A protein has these predicted regions:
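Acidic, Ser/Thr- and proline-rich intrinsically disordered linker/docking segments
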Residues: 2-7, 15-57
């Protein structure tokens, strides 16, 4: 399994397991398409999505 650490909150996801650690960092297991991130702006969300998919390649 591949986990990616993200310091922001994720909302409205499809087939993604969310794991919160004691320091409140968020790990996601990507098993499907992420529909929307809540990073304050849509541009920030798209940049974060692009960064994640590059890590998954």
């Amino acid at each position: 399994m591949k986990f990616i650490k993200i310091k922001n909150t994720i909302v409205n996801v499809a087939e993604i397991k969310l794991i919160y650690t004691h320091d409140q960092l968020l790990y996601i297991e990507c098993t499907d398409i992420v529909h929307r991130f809540d990073f304050g702006t849509e541009i920030g969300a798209m940049e974060e999505l692009n960064r994640i998919y590059k890590q998954l390649e």
